Structures are given as C-alpha cells and as structure tokens.
C-alpha cells in the first residue's frame, strides 16, 4: 500500500498533506502521518560565525532540494553527529535582524556541544516548532530571545524524555 492510500483520522495520508503540514511547522502532525520523526541530512558549512559572537555557536547545515524543510521558524530538534544524537534548537530563516533579502539558512545550536564539525554530514530530526522568525530591533533583544529559546528547548526535552532503551537504539 502506498503512502497516498493510507489514512489517519479519516483523512488520506499523502505527500501533499505532509508538505502542507511541514510548511506550517506542524511537526506533530507530520511525525504522526509518517509514523516517525521527520529528518533531513546535510553537510555542516562555514557561515558568518555570528552565532558564535552572540554566545550561540551554530552548525550551518546545507539543505538539499530533495528535502522539504519545515516552514520558517525556530524548532526543537535532535542532531546526529558522528553517530551520536544531541539535543538542539534549530532555526530555519533569513536572519532578518541582520538585513533583508538574505537566503534561507538552517542553523542548529547543539546544547552542551563544543566540537568543530565543519564538513561533517549531520542528520536533523525535527520535533517541535517553538516560534516563527522575528526581526529584532537590537542584538541584545535577539540574545534575550535565544536564551529563552534555549530554556524552552531544554524544558521540551525534560517534558518529553527519551528512555534509555530508545536512546541506545537511536544511537546505533
């Protein structure tokens, strides 16, 4: 049976419905429809290093056209680096605080992670949308929001713990 032939809550499960929910950032529905957490894979590239100067060094992850990204916003994610999963908050956006007309980037801030991983292929597992993209009037306002996002990300993981058995399985 193909994906388009299945149903969830009396509605057809098809790629159009999944893409629509991805565009909306509705990862709960996407993950329910798929039966697993949505993932994308990309290579960590050098960026502008602005996150590091703000106290939030990010992995700038390339995004291939084969993957449909969730809508613009900030998300609770897990990022797999060298076979190990890390809790993260990930932004998909144009960094509008720093100018207009910028390209869409995927930037993951891995919690409790200090390694340089340029050139590494990573997998991003998308769990929950925290908020949309905001244009801040000041860098101080952005940093304040990033601190709140980090707290919200940690709170999400505390409220949705992964069991030891599941953690061992996903780290295989």
Map each language-model feature to its residues:
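Short, well-structured alpha-helical segments that form the helix of a local strand-helix-strand
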Residues: 29-35, 142, 146
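Long, positively charged amphipathic alpha-helical accessory segments at protein N-termini or as interdomain linkers
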Residues: 9, 14-15, 37, 81-82, ...
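Phosphate/ribose-recognition catalytic cores of enzymes acting on nucleotide-derived substrates
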Residues: 3, 46-172
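Residue-level detector of secondary-structure transition/capping positions
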Residues: 37-38, 150
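Short amphipathic
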Residues: 39-47
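Acidic/polar loop patches that form or flank catalytic/metal-binding clefts of enzymes
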Residues: 31, 41, 87
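Contiguous mid-protein beta-loop-alpha structural module that forms a pocket-lining wall or clamp
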Residues: 1-33
């Amino acid at each position: 049976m193909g994906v388009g032939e299945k149903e969830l809550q009396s509605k057809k499960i098809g790629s159009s419905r999944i893409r629509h929910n991805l565009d909306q950032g509705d990862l709960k529905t996407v993950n329910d429809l798929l039966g697993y957490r949505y993932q994308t894979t990309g290579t960590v590239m050098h960026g502008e290093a602005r996150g590091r100067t703000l106290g939030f060094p990010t992995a700038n992850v390339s995004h291939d056209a084969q993957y449909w990204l969730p809508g613009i916003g900030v998300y609770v994610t897990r990022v797999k680096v060298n076979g190990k999963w890390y809790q993260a908050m990930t932004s998909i956006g144009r960094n509008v605080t720093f100018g207009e007309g910028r390209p869409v980037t995927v930037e993951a801030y891995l919690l409790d992670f200090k390694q340089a991983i340029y050139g590494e292929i990573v997998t991003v597992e998308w769990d929950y949308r925290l908020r949309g993209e905001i244009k801040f009037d000041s860098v101080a306002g952005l940093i304040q929001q990033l601190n709140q996002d980090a707290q919200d990300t940690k709170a999400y993981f505390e409220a949705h713990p992964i069991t030891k058995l599941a953690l061992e399985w996903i780290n295989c």
